Structures are given as structure tokens and as C-alpha cells.
Amino acid sequence: CHNQEILEWETSCSSGKIVESHIDGLGHRVQNIFIDNFNGQLKITSKGILKTKDLSGIVKGLKEKVNPLCFLRDTDLTKPCEKIEKISNEAKKNNKNIIEFAHKLNLVVSNSINYVSGSTTISTSSKDALKQKKGVCQDFAHILISAARFNNLPARYINGFLLEETNSGENTTHAWVEIFVNDLGWIAFDPSHKK
């Protein structure tokens, strides 16, 4: 990624060993782990030092390996439903441009369900999360992706590590969305945090 440089990186696994490392078709580093006797628990630890640049959530100028139009396809978790159409219609009111619409769409999605830890699983669809009116970060992300794609905006699921500014030690994995805008690039949105 052009806004970060990896200075040091190390990955370890409690119940196995890393046997192969390669770059996938999207340009991501993949590490394969071999586990001889799986005991039901697996702890993977990655640590490193990165040098980053603040780009205000906009990723521009990357040499993409995948055309953004590929991120218009529905998945089982992001198939649009009637509630996605309602979210879209609400977000379409009074927008001057596509960026303003994307921000409004993010806000409407942010207000569409309540964040309730443990209320869903990794297989919960955007439709199901909207139906029960609660979910976690991945559900907010799936809903925003569904709504963006419904409006012909390429959108992709991003996950990473959320660094809490309170230094409480409660840092965790997190999911958010990037929406592609022509002539600008990918813009990050975090609907579960209304950002």
C-alpha cells in the first residue's frame, strides 16, 4: 500500500508453523500454516513496525490488480433486499455529488442497526442483520457494501486492526468499507463508528 511502509514484520502461530508465504492475485501477502495436531484452539500473532502517511481515508493512485467494477458483484452476505432499497432512497435526498451521497449512505447505514457484541456470526447476511436491527462491525460493513453496490458504486470489505486512542489495551480486529469514486480512488467508511 502506498501510504505505508513495512519496516519490520513477524508472524507466529501457537499450534503450527508457517510453511509458505506468497502474494495473492489482489497483491496481499498470504501465509499458509501447517497444523499437525489441531487441539481446537489456534493463536496467530503478527507484530511489526510500519511507517504510515495520513491520507484522510482516501486510497488513490494504486496500481490495482482487480478492476473496481469487480466490486459491484453481490455475494450471499451482501445481496440487496427491500430494506437496502429504503436505505438508498433515504440517502439520495439532497446530495450535490457522489462523495456527499457516499457519506450520507454511510450515515444512514450507521443508524440502521444497533451495535450489539455477539449478536451475529460471520455468516449473517446484511438482510438478516437489518431484520434483527442489530449486529457488529462486519454487519455494518455488509449493509454498506450492499447499499453502495445497489447504487452502482464499487465497494469492498476491509478488515484490519483497530487501534483504540485510549491506550486501554482493548485493541481488536475491525471491519469497514472502501467505496470507489472515479477520478479519486477508494474512500474508507466506518459505519459502525459513524466515520
Where are these regions (language model features)?
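Residue-level signal for pocket-adjacent positions within structured domains
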Residues: 21, 25-30, 67, 125, ...
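Short, conserved charged micro-motifs
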Residues: 57-58, 187
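Intrinsically disordered, low-complexity N-terminal segments that are enriched in acidic
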Residues: 1-55
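Generic structural "secondary-structure junction" signal
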Residues: 13-15, 28, 35-37, 52, ...
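A broad, low-specificity signal for short, low-complexity segments enriched in glycine/proline
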Residues: 2-11, 116-118, 136-141, 149, ...
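Hydrophobic/aromatic-rich core segments of domains that either
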Residues: 139-195
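Short intrinsically disordered coil segments
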Residues: 9-11, 59-69, 191-194
